[in-house]
Amino acid sequence: MTVPFFERSEQAITELARKHGNAVARVARNILGNEQDTEECVNDTYLGTWKAIPPNRPSPLRTFVCKIARNLATMKYHANTAEKRNSHYDVALNELEDCFSDGKSIEDEYDAKELSDAINSFLATLNYTDRFIFTRRYWYSDPLQDIAKMANTTTNSVTVRLFRIREKLKHYLVKEGLLV
């Protein structure tokens, strides 16, 4: 799928939108909660992907594109909500905050790559359902009700599982020496 990007073919963006457009839009929409901002973010994601390939050769492409969308949506979200906080995205971030620090930002305390590797290793220890729930909540920023429907369970069950997963994550990070 990255070949058209290397050839600088105009079809690259069309194919990207066809194959991964829904996922990109969902990531942006879950963070921004606004169709106009979502559409702008999706278009910026396509442009960012066009600029990033080449030189990057992402595999898998979907993860690469969703990461660009997530970063752009997060920046736009923070710009839009500098004064007000309370969306489900803030709630999801606040849930994870206790796993990482005592008020300092993650960037101040840890090398992002090391933390990312540790979280990926932790996720590999989880069963499929827990990994799915954690990823849908903290990567895709899905609302709890949507996750419950996708996992064929109750919202309360998802909430309890996320709490237990966060506790396991805290213990894992302490064991790995990344959290004191």
Predicted segments with their positions:
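Amphipathic alpha-helical recognition patches that constitute DNA-binding helices
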Residues: 12-15, 23, 27, 37, ...
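Short alpha-helical "packing" element that flanks the helix-turn-helix/winged-helix DNA-binding module
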Residues: 133-134
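Acidic, proline/glycine-rich intrinsically disordered inter-domain spacer in sigma factors
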Residues: 94-124
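DNA-recognition helix of helix-turn-helix
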Residues: 74, 119, 130, 139, ...
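N-terminal module of bacterial RNA polymerase sigma factors
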Residues: 1-23, 30, 107, 140, ...
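Structural recognition of an alpha-helix C-terminal capping motif at a helix-to-coil junction
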Residues: 40-47, 51, 59-71
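Amphipathic, Lys/Arg- and hydrophobic-enriched alpha-helical face
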Residues: 16-35, 50-52, 123, 175
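Arg/Lys-rich amphipathic alpha helix in sigma70-family domain 2
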Residues: 67-89, 112, 175
